């Protein structure tokens, strides 16, 4: 009944289109509205500002709710586009209320200079709408306000901010289609932190950035970072150019580090698409009003920066996309090294104490006692995974072509039919080590492999597809098809059966087979040499496999990745 009354009040209020304030603003930043408020606001903005606002749907959720986006600005197709998405984790909903507030202030000319001059804003108020409607007071126990909020995951219990590459959720598939269509130069993902307590209000990660590369787009990322830090400081905010997560959990003395996100995450994915990605994390222990305001200021400052530099950044992005990767060494991922510098960090007094509840050490903060921490900051990165790109591209056999094509279509990757020529000389990847995850993660059993590519003769059956490396999404293609990449199809378990043994040789059968094989002097000498290794000598399974792998019955496709390179 309460919800029906609220719906009636909202419908009548927005029908007048004179008051475009959110429930959050009307409540003094104590509450946030439901999804119906977003729909009504979307239409009300469009009605009041038809030349500046377009309210559109880009799909439906599994539970039948509308997926909405709002286009704000003069819609000149030559404008650089800024993408701002909120509520991918629906309990972290600051961005929804912040951008509606900012839109109102811009369109009602409460901001002196128009930050949308020459810029188009694409705003998704709620990415995870089904999760948003799982409303509750304790959905975010590590967060101060609003009074009620949505849930982290979708109706399928998927975390959408792990879904950018595999795109399992219908919501992600729909959103990526829209993202490709509008092609933003800068994309913001608006979140709220978990974790420690400290003074700064927001942490912002921008990639690409000069701390891990030197292209024009990396330089653009650093320029945006520096500009945002200056603007946010001028607007009275305490902001950080990194995500404030301790190197070791609950140990402030271990400090912080920079990192380049893998493409399962929003900002890592946008970087893999050769665009600028921003993760904006307001601090969960600040009150809702403070958090909404810092999101407001961050989006406003970003619009100002893109208005000033956006066209140059678009050119830089296209230059980066047009870089030919074929046959070159490519850095797939990064880590920071052990070098650090001490920084002053505005934290709070804390102590580590033994818990009477769990018996372990826990941290206790004293937010009423600010304290300067001198902690290490790790900012020197190195590539922890490097791969030579194929000279021409990747070949996917017909057995996997159907589902692979569906994934490639979602991400805007071009492919074509492959015409086999009998036995093709191709690069084949065979794993030397593999480790399956012990538990399911996001509905997948992940797999980590090591190995190498080597030339072999391969017979490809009809129905295969070819993904050329010379296209503008080449870096993203390598993230999908290089098996050692952290978010590749292999890593997400799409090819697990290829790395599972299916046939075997009984122990009693091997006894006779091995004795016959030992009549070969070369085999006997190799076996004798291997027996000098204690690990081999004491492991019956390794000794068994030594002979089985040399036998004609051995499965030559076992541990062979069923995608090839040319």
Locations of the language-model features?
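Accessory, solvent-exposed terminal regions and/or long lumenal/extracellular loops of proteins
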Residues: 473-475, 484-566
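Short glycine- and acidic-rich boundary segments immediately preceding or forming the N-terminal edge
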Residues: 17-68
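Active-site-proximal beta-strand/loop segments in catalytic clefts of secreted hydrolases
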Residues: 58-60, 72-73, 86-88, 124-128, ...
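Bacterial Sec-dependent N-terminal signal peptides
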Residues: 1-19
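Hard-cation-handling environments
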Residues: 245-426, 430-431
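Feature captures C-terminal
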Residues: 354-492, 496-515
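Active-site/substrate-binding loop(s) of hydrolase catalytic cores
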Residues: 78-88, 93-253, 258-264
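Proline/glycine-enriched tight loop/beta-turn segments at coil->beta junctions
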Residues: 65-66, 74-81
């Amino acid at each position: 009944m309460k919800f029906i009354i609220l719906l009636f009040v909202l419908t009548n209020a927005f029908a007048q289109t004179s008051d475009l304030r959110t429930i959050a603003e009307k409540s003094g930043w104590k509450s946030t509205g439901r999804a119906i408020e977003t729909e009504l606001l979307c239409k009300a903005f469009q009605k009041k500002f038809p030349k500046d606002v377009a309210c559109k749907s880009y799909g439906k959720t599994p539970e039948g709710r509308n997926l909405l986006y709002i286009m704000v600005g003069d819609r000149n197709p030559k404008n650089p586009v800024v993408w701002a998405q909120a509520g991918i984790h629906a309990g972290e909903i600051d961005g929804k209320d912040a951008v509606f507030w900012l839109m109102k202030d811009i369109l009602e000319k409460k901001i002196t200079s128009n930050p949308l001059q020459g810029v188009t804003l694409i705003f998704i108020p709620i990415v995870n709408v089904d999760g948003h409607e799982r409303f509750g007071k304790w959905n975010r126990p590590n967060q101060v306000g609003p009074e009620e909020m949505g849930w982290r995951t979708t109706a399928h219990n998927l975390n959408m901010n792990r879904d950018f590459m595999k795109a399992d959720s219908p919501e992600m598939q729909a959103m990526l289609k829209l993202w490709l269509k509008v092609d933003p130069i800068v994309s913001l993902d608006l979140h709220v932190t978990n974790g420690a307590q400290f003074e700064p209000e927001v942490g912002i990660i921008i990639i690409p950035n000069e701390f891990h590369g030197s292209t024009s787009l990396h330089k653009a990322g650093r320029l945006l970072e520096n500009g945002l830090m200056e603007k946010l400081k001028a607007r009275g905010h305490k902001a950080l150019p990194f995500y404030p997560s301790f190197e070791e959990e609950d140990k402030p003395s271990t400090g912080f580090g920079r990192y380049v996100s893998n493409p399962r995450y929003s900002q890592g994915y946008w970087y893999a698409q050769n665009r600028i990605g921003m993760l904006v994390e307001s601090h969960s222990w600040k009150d809702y009003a403070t958090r909404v305001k810092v999101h407001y200021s961050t989006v406003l400052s970003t619009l100002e920066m893109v208005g000033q530099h956006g066209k140059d950044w678009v050119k830089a992005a296209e230059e980066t996309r047009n870089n030919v990767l074929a046959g070159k060494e490519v850095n797939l991922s990064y880590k920071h090294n052990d070098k650090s510098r001490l920084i002053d960090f505005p934290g709070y007094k804390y102590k580590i104490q033994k818990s009477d509840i769990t018996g372990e050490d826990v941290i206790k903060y004293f937010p009423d006692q600010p304290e300067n921490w001198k902690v290490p900051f790790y900012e020197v990165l190195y590539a922890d995974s490097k791969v030579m790109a194929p000279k021409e591209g990747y070949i996917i056999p017909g057995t996997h072509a159907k589902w692979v094509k569906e994934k490639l279509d979602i991400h805007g990757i071009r492919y074509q039919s492959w015409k086999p020529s009998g036995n093709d000389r191709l690069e084949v990847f065979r794993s030397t080590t593999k480790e399956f995850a012990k538990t399911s993660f996001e509905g997948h059993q992940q797999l980590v492999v090591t190995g190498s590519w080597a030339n072999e003769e391969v017979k490809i059956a009809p129905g295969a597809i070819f993904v050329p490396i010379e296209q503008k999404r080449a870096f993203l293609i390598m993230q999908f098809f290089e098996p050692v990449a952290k978010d590749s199809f292999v890593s997400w378990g799409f090819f697990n059966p290829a790395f599972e043994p299916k046939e075997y040789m009984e122990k009693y059968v091997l006894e006779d087979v091995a004795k016959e094989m030992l009549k070969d002097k070369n085999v006997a000498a190799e076996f004798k040499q291997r027996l000098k290794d204690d690990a081999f000598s004491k492991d019956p399974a390794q000794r068994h496999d030594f002979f089985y792998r040399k036998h004609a019955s051995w499965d030559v496709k076992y541990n062979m990745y069923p995608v090839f390179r040319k």
